[in-house]
Amino acid sequence: MLQWLAEFHASFPAFNVFRYITFRTGGAVVTALLFVFLFGPGMISTLRLKQGKGQPIRTDGPQSHLLTKKGTPTMGGLMILSGIVVATLLWANLSNPYVWVVLGVTLGFGLIGFYDDYLKVTKQTHNGLSGKARLAIEAVIAGVAVVIVMSVGKPGLSTSVAFPFFKDLLLNLGMFFAIFGMFVIVAAGNAVNLTDGLDGLAIVPVMIAAGSFGFIAYLAGNVVFADYLQIHYVAGVGELAVICGALMGAGLGFLWFNAPPAQVFMGDTGSLALGGLLGTVAVATKHEIVLAVIGGLFVLEAVSVIVQVVSFKLTGKRVFKMAPIHHHFEQLGWTEPQVVIRFWIVAVVLALAGLATLKLR
């Protein structure tokens, strides 16, 4: 919204800064951070009052969780999403279609997660919205988003998959790209959702991934930098750096309240939405495969659940003591802070590896 002030730079030279994505990204970070800081306590109090017993805790998990996490309110993702929306509307170029596509997926997935959390809290059970129904709605939202991205992007490129390390290798999937893109977004949303099981575990890797993809979006949306790095130029996609900045700011604000012992959980409201946001940015910037590297921690968590379920159904035996894998390490004797901080370190290393693919080609 504030970008229009740049039109008056002739009369007010200082307004010229609103043209720059870097400046507006910084503004989005600060705005989202302050918003969550200021309104977070009130939102947490409201959630605690409305929810009563808070998020139901798994009885088959680590016994310490029954003592340390009981009564903690969920749906804290509302804080994050509010910060993202306010900062994006204030600092992003609202005429950019990519901005609305990413916001649409984020809020759509957030609504799914909110309803899921609502069912769990009101019924005090882990059985919220059925898995099939949830995946079906997610697929519809993601499918619409991908079709829009395909329609506004450059013909040929918008339906192709780019591969890291190979500057000229593109696999044009044609209309089948809609299925691939839909899978990326839905998988990202659910992978982040599975990661959100310990205080602070999901939000920091999400911020790391958002920072990485904000950087990628800025480079891919700049014809000079894209040409220098020999990555595919996508006109207009640089504006997504502002949304990624908003996520980072809102995430930092949320972490203040989510640091152990957490005052609030983001719930499916936040985890599904943030994962969907990252997946959509990856599709728009043509870095879907790089998302699997930068977000490798989320992939690991999701794969651990798949392996556990498949193994148990086929052999009756479990590969891990408990899935997702962060609970496996808890069962091995790692303390919650050890698991969380070590997983953060893994997320940083994977992000650096993913960013290295921009140059190693």
Curated annotation (Swiss-Prot):
Gene Ontology MF terms in the entry: metal ion binding; phospho-N-acetylmuramoyl-pentapeptide-transferase activity; UDP-N-acetylmuramoyl-L-alanyl-D-glutamyl-meso-2,6-diaminopimelyl-D-alanyl-D-alanine:undecaprenyl-phosphate transferase activity
Cofactor(s) of this protein: Mg(2+)
PANTHER family found in the cross-reference section: PHOSPHO-N-ACETYLMURAMOYL-PENTAPEPTIDE-TRANSFERASE, PHOSPHO-N-ACETYLMURAMOYL-PENTAPEPTIDE-TRANSFERASE HOMOLOG
One matching Pfam family: MraY_sig1
Reactions the enzyme catalyzes: UDP-N-acetyl-alpha-D-muramoyl-L-alanyl-gamma-D-glutamyl-meso-2,6-diaminopimeloyl-D-alanyl-D-alanine + di-trans,octa-cis-undecaprenyl phosphate = di-trans,octa-cis-undecaprenyl diphospho-N-acetyl-alpha-D-muramoyl-L-alanyl-D-glutamyl-meso-2,6-diaminopimeloyl-D-alanyl-D-alanine + UMP
EC number: 2.7.8.13
Gene that this polypeptide is encoded by: mraY
Phylogenetic classification of the source organism: Bacteria, Pseudomonadati, Pseudomonadota, Alphaproteobacteria, Hyphomicrobiales
Protein name (database record): Phospho-N-acetylmuramoyl-pentapeptide-transferase
InterPro entries referenced in this protein's UniProt entry, alphabetically: Glycosyl_transferase_4 (IPR000715), PNAcMuramoyl-5peptid_Trfase (IPR003524), PNAcMuramoyl-5peptid_Trfase_CS (IPR018480)
The family this protein is said to belong to: Belongs to the glycosyltransferase 4 family. MraY subfamily.
Membrane topology: Multi-pass membrane protein
